[in-house]
Each structure stands twice: as C-alpha cells, then as structure tokens.
C-alpha cells in the first residue's frame, strides 16, 4: 500500500516536524501594577513590542492595558482577581458581564487563558467559590463564541508535599480535596494547570545550593530519583516534576503545566542580586525552550515575574526582596540585565 512507503513516511515525518509548535517554550512576562511608578499601559505594551516579548500575564482587567494590547499579537493571560470569585460564582449573569466587558469587547486581543484566581488557598474568602466561578466563566466564554480561550486557575508549590524525590510528589490533604474538582474540570476541558514556581525560596530557606537553584551545571545537589531513575540537574525541574507526580495521583496525569510565574529578585534577600537574577532568567529561558523536564521532555510555557519592581509589595521588614523582582527599572524603562525573550 502507498501508506507504507518508506519515502512517504519520511516526508510525513518532515511535515510533522515542520508544523510542530515551537513557540510553546517562549518566555512571557508578568505585568504587575502594584508599584506607584509603573509606566502607563500603552508604554508597557510598546516595551513588550520593542523587546519582542511574545506573551503577557496581567492580574486583573485594566481597560487602558487591554486597549493598548489591541492588534499587538501578544498572547495574553488575564486573571480574575480573587476578590471577584464569589460574585462570579453566585451569578451566571455576572460572569457573562465580566466576559463581555473584559474579553469579548477586545476581539483583537490574543487571549490565551483566563486564570480564575491566583494562589487561592482553602479556607480563604472566595475559596469555596473557585470551581463554580471557573465553570461560569467557561460557560460565558462558550456562549460568546470564545471557547478557544482556556479557563484555568493558578496555584503554587505550597499545596505540594513529599516533593523529594519528585516521583513522590502529592498534594497535601486539604489541598487535594480543594483541587480535586478543579483538576476534573481541567481534564474535561483539556486546559492546563497554571503553577507559580520559584527556586529562589528553596535557596533562601537553605534547602538547596545556589547553583542548583540557578539552573547552573555541576551542582552538588544533583540527584537521581530512585523510583524512576530520572536525573535532576536543577531545582526547577524537580519542582515541576513533583507537580506532575501530584497531578497523576489526583487524576490529572494528562494535564500540562504552564509555569505562570518564576523569577529571581535583584536585591533585598540572601542571594538576591543582579548577576544572580540575570543567570537565573537566562538559564531558565534556554532550558524551557529546549529541554523540558526529565519527566516531560517538551517545551515549557513559562512567564517571568516580573516586568517591573513593585515597591508596595513589601509585607514585612524580612520580605524586602518582594519589591525587587522586576527585570526593568520602572523609572528608566531600561533592562537591569541582559536577556533575550525569543
């Protein structure tokens, strides 16, 4: 038969390689707006274009930013703020209005995901409303003819336990019960789970060496997972694969993970410096574009936190580093260190 021709199979394999989505690992950047000297949104979008940053995450609707994104071709994650969850869960009409005003109205913006909530924790106000809010937003998007926009939520490493070795990863009991319906929703909709992963905190807490946290080679923390013989050369991969293991144990083994935040501060804490931030961001950029993790050897969609330093983020004198995650100075609009985004 013709289909069994070696030459035809070879040509088909070339065609598949040509059409493979090579953009999956391209780096995006989170645009937070908590600072009191952040440039206006039109300037920020112009900077994304100037530096060829292909993706943006923003933590809530901002009409000026959404208007500036029109026609920009920047792929976009828009968050539903945690404070809106209960209102949107209680009323399908409210969810419809939210989608109409913040998504449907901007039909020339490349919405990719709607993240319903960011790092929602069990017992917090609105936590019980999370899954219903996700369902209502999803229904509103479908009714508006926008079912190509995926609905998800953003979690973090806090729900995970037994992350060493990664194959033992699982969710803490209180989070497993909380996340189970979310995971079921994501599996049904074939949407990814968004996860914030920061290797900096492992270094700050003295759990791992600086090299291992910065994705630098020949760290004394490198190890082989005894349960599957996968080799781990950096802390980022170990974190990510522990999430995949936890998802497998919770019925979410088919899910992809989007790393919705990762970064390194430039001052204010142990190991927080411009050279270390430069090393981390560049090592991460190369890694997620080429290698994937030992468990999932494919490009990893990743967003760097953050575009700018955000002075009001400090929560206590011990958290000075929280103000200094930005890659750009908000006053000079210049990069603090060298990095390419594509």
Curated annotation (Swiss-Prot):
PTM summary: The N-terminus is blocked.
**Cross-referenced InterPro entries:** Glyco_hydro_17, Glyco_hydro_17_plant, Glycoside_hydrolase_SF
Q: What is this protein called?
A: Glucan endo-1,3-beta-glucosidase
**Listed GO biological process terms:** carbohydrate metabolic process; defense response
* Protein purpose: Is thought to be an important plant defense-related product against fungal pathogens. Accumulation of the glucanase can be detected as early as 4 hours after inoculation.
Quote the cellular component terms of the Gene Ontology held in the record. Answer: vacuole
Its subcellular locations are: Vacuole
Q: Where is the active site?
A: 119, 261
Induction pattern: Following incompatible or compatible interaction with pathogenic bacteria, but not by wounding or salicylic acid. The induction is localized and does not seem to result from a systemic response. Induction occurs more rapidly with an incompatible interaction.
Q: Point out the gene that encodes the protein.
A: BGL
Q: Which UniProt keywords apply?
A: Glycosidase, Hydrolase, Plant defense, Signal, Vacuole
Q: What is its EC number?
A: 3.2.1.39
**Which SUPFAM superfamilies does this chain map to?**
(Trans)glycosidases
Keyword field contains Signal: yes
Give the reactions, separated by semicolons, that this protein catalyses.
Answer: Hydrolysis of (1->3)-beta-D-glucosidic linkages in (1->3)-beta-D-glucans
Recorded GO molecular functions are: glucan endo-1,3-beta-D-glucosidase activity
Q: Which domain of life is it from?
A: Eukaryota
Keyword Ribonucleoprotein in annotation? no
Location (main, coarse): other
Signal sequence coordinates: 1-26
What's the family?
Belongs to the glycosyl hydrolase 17 family.
């Amino acid at each position: 038969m013709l289909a069994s021709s070696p030459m035809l199979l070879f040509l088909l394999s070339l065609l598949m390689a040509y059409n493979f989505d090579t953009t999956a690992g391209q780096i995006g950047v989170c645009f937070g707006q908590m600072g009191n000297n952040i440039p206006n949104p039109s300037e920020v979008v112009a900077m994304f274009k100037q530096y060829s940053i292909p993706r943006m995450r923003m933590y809530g609707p901002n009409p000026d930013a959404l208007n500036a994104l029109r026609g920009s071709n920047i792929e976009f994650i828009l968050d539903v703020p945690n404070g809106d969850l209960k209102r949107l869960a209680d009323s399908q009409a409210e969810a419809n209005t939210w989608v109409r005003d913040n998504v449907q109205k901007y039909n020339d913006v490349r919405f990719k995901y709607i993240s319903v909530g960011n790092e929602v924790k069990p017992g917090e106000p609105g936590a019980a409303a999370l899954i219903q809010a996700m369902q209502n937003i999803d229904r509103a998007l479908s009714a508006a003819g926008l079912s190509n926009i995926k609905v998800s939520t953003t979690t973090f490493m806090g729900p995970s336990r037994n992350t060493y070795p990664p194959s033992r990863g699982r969710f803490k009991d209180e989070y497993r019960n909380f996340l189970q319906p979310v995971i079921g929703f994501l599996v049904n909709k074939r949407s990814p789970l968004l996860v914030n992963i920061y290797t900096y905190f492992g270094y700050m807490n003295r759990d791992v060496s600086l090299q291992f946290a910065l994705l630098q080679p020949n760290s004394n923390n490198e190890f082989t997972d005894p349960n599957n013989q996968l080799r781990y050369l950096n802390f980022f991969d170990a974190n990510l694969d522990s999430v995949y293991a936890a998802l497998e144990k919770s019925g979410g083994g088919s899910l992809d993970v989007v790393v919705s935040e990762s970064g390194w501060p430039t001052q204010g804490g142990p190991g927080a410096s411009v050279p270390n931030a430069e090393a981390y961001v560049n090592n991460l950029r190369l890694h997620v574009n080429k290698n994937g993790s030992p468990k999932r050897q494919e490009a990893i969609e990743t967003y760097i936190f953050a575009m700018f330093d955000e002075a009001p983020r400090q929560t206590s004198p011990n958290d000075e580093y929280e103000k200094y995650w930005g890659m750009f100075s908000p006053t000079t609009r210049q990069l603090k260190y060298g990095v390419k985004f594509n």
